[in-house]
């Protein structure tokens, strides 16, 4: 193995992030910005799609809108937490509506827009790290 191959092998895989937001332009824009920042990002527009894709893609984190057309963010989070295949996913709620009672207790983090994308990236990374530590403590 040469130095270039060794460097590539040492690079961690990008974090997989799923944006769940019913506003297509917002969801698509967030996913694109996350990709530019080195995340493996995709998006869906409903809670049901989010639950299925989170499971299929084995994502590390979801950036979850509070208000979706088929279920609210709390319900999506609860379903992720009840499923042994998705319990380890970090949940970062996001909304433009200001504070949402209980959001900090349900998910791993809460963001209110407008927010700097650098903060979004940092919160996602920190939430994934905390979630992984919590999950490791239970194993």
Tell me what each language-model feature is.
Residues 1-16, 118-139:
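Non-catalytic signal-transmission and effector/linker regions of two-component phosphorelay proteins
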Residues 21, 65, 95:
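Active-site residues of response regulator receiver
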Residues 23-27, 68, 117:
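Short acidic/polar segment at the start of the alpha1 helix of CheY-like receiver
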Residues 24-42:
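Two-component/phosphorelay signaling modules centered on CheY-like receiver
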Residues 46-49, 72-75:
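Acidic catalytic/metal-coordinating carboxylates
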Residues 58-63, 68:
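Active-site beta3 strand of CheY-like receiver
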Residues 69, 87:
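The feature encodes the CheY-like receiver
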Residues 75, 96-113, 117-125:
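Alpha4 helix (beta4-alpha4-beta5 surface) of REC/receiver domains from two-component response regulators
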